[in-house]
Amino acid sequence: MPSIFTHQWDTPVYKGSTSINTGLFINGEFVDGVKNTTIDVVNPANGKLITKISEATEADIDIAVEAAHKAFETTWGLNCSGSKRGDMLYKLAQLMEKNIDDLSAIEALDNGKTFLWAKSVDLSLSISTIKHYAGWADKNFGQVIETDEKKLTYSRHEPIGVVGQIIPWNFPLLMLAWKIGPALATGNCIVLKPSEFTPLSALRMCALIQEAGFPPGVVNVVTGYGSTTGQAISSHMKIDKVAFTGSTLVGRKVMEAAAKSNLKNVTLELGGKSPVVIFDDADLEQSVNWTAHGLFWNHGQACCAGTRIFVQEGIYDKFLQKFTDKIKEIKLGDPFGLGIDQGPQVSQIQYDRIMSYIESGRAEGATVHVGGERHGNEGYFIQPTIFTDTTPDMKIVKEEIFGPVGAVIKFKDGKEVIKQANDSNYGLAAAVFSQDINKAIETAHAFKAGTAWVNCANTIDAGVPFGGYKQSGIGRELGEYALHNYTNVKAVHVNLNWKM
């Protein structure tokens, strides 16, 4: 039998305990993996072992897929009404609200984000997402299409079947909600793999999924490595769709595996190198505040982080000074500490990756204007870092770093800055700051990006679509658009009085 992980917190911001089954969640129960191997889960705040979780192998994926198929053919899919699916989703959201402190603490423990941030942002958005799709479950309509008087013609939106979902470590619970919400609302069954770095909130959610009344096999959670468990999901011949959030590099591998197997439907939400354009007429105070939020939220570990900050020459010096002052106010430390703004990066691997980019920036001739060093003596903490004196060909300007590192770049001409902003392989998001609303909207429309923020940054809502252009992905998360990711459209032609 799988072990139970328990943990007690007695901190300035939270006092409580949790209990998490560390097994694989297959067919409505926790089980050991076939090979009974485990993965270490590490606390990024101190580098110490939290617990061990079961590792899913290809054989475990086969078992999970069979359970999902059985549920789809018997208790879910077209065998369960949209209103019943919606009731269960809403019950799940209520249980998340009831357990919000527990889930927030778990998120802070293995991810490193602060407890207060996890509660106010991640959990709030996760709950609103599940509620949003609870409302959609009985409203996924087709339409009657007028052709001629001899026929009745209409469309149906039908669930795809068994979907594989692979989620990242930067927003573990939120990405789970983004994935399972629309998939369950439309009647699909799920085999989901959380990141091996941050699996605990997904495993805790399995107990809530049980309590909410979802039939066995509808949601299966399999923990493991991307190269093995993720690969097995992407290439499985009986999985009808795969949805992946993560790096563009791995997204290519997922798409390739999907194509080489059964040409399964693919949704990808991938990397970004988002531009922020600040014109001379911008509200200086607000642009500083929003830009800091856009770059440093979640410790810079966000695909839509505004890392290329273009500031018009008329306010460049003032902006840089105020932005520097703002950055120096950011307080790093224990995710369960009082007044902490930024915790550690998620892992040693990610810490090393970010520090290598900082060294690359120095080596290529950029200036570290602020930050650029490790913080403290333990854990994976990195100072918020800004480069100046960059050129477009530098790695820190071109490549996604996925950490608290950005570049502030001076520009002169409004038309030229759009070319610079769009000069990227990515196109996930962009932001513009100007008090001239016509100029701001014109700039927003000129961005080659799936999301454009005007006088704000990194604002997300469950009802608003999110996704990328170019190498930032395929398909859209959130809102009504996400339902399309999980449905097949069937056209039905009914002969009324057409004689041959």
Curated annotation (Swiss-Prot):
Reactions catalysed: an aldehyde + NAD(+) + H2O = a carboxylate + NADH + 2 H(+)
Active-site residue list: E269, C303
Positions that bind NAD(+): G246, S247, T248, L249, V250, G251
GO biological process: ethanol catabolic process
Site (Transition state stabilizer): N170
EC number of this enzyme: 1.2.1.3
Pfam families: Aldedh
InterPro entries registered for this protein in UniProt: Ald_DH/histidinol_DH, Ald_DH_C, Ald_DH_CS_CYS, Ald_DH_CS_GLU, Ald_DH_N, Aldehyde_DH_dom
SUPFAM superfamilies associated with the record: ALDH-like
This protein's pathway: Alcohol metabolism; ethanol degradation; acetate from ethanol: step 2/2
GO molecular function, one term: aldehyde dehydrogenase (NAD+) activity
UniProt keyword list: NAD, Oxidoreductase
Superkingdom per UniProt: Eukaryota
PANTHER family: ALDEHYDE DEHYDROGENASE-RELATED (PTHR11699)
Family the entry assigns: Belongs to the aldehyde dehydrogenase family.
Protein name: Aldehyde dehydrogenase
Species of origin: Agaricus bisporus (White button mushroom)
